[in-house]
Amino acid sequence: MKKSLTVGCVIMASGLSRRFGANKLLADFCGQPMLCRAFAATATPGIAARIVVTRSEEVQELCRAHGVPVLLHSLSGRNDTVRLGLSALLEQLPELSGCMFLPGDQPLLCRETVETMTERFCLEQPCPAEWQKETEREIFRLGAVAENDPTPLVGSPVLFGSSFFPELLTLPENKGGNVLLKKYPAQVRTVCIADSAELLDADTPEALQQLEVLARLKN
């Protein structure tokens, strides 16, 4: 038997928020900066380590105020965010089995969903070495099945097994992990949830308002 698998999480917060008109991650959502929702969603034992990767000093200050590890950088590519975040986690946990990449702008994503994804990856119980090795060659993405449509709506977060780390660290310029989902479709597993709203991001102030209405209705 091997020890249980270990999952890290990169919270991606390097976007420019062009459509939003301001730093959307700092916008108020139900009484707190929207990024705080990502803090709450990833505060689970299933995430052994997490880090926010950002180009914003204000976001850096927010992370520090909440005790969330943060990496400030000035690079522009999506590949840079992936590489910097994963590299930082691997420095902390060299034996990392998987890494989740979670956008900071999906405020309805809940902790239970993150736990479901990590449990699916870790298979809940310690397992034989060959089974673990197989799991580390898989990619888990979040999805939701809509009524009258058997094809799931898919999106983020996405959890990559460790066998994909070398390619994640050397992605093409300005490309993200979706490159690997297209390259290895047979290795992609979809973790479906009931509420498709968890997949929605807040790219505009109007979208943020709509998501806040949904959040208040749930409460």
PLM segments and residue spans:
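Conserved alpha/beta core of the MobA/IspD/sugar-nucleotide pyrophosphorylase nucleotidyltransferase superfamily
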Residues: 2-5, 166, 170-219
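Short aromatic/basic micro-patch
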Residues: 28, 108, 158-159, 190, ...
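Hydrophobic residues at beta-strand termini and immediately following loops
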Residues: 29, 71-73, 142, 191-193, ...
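Conserved N-terminal catalytic core of the sugar/cofactor nucleotidyltransferase
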Residues: 36-101, 112-113
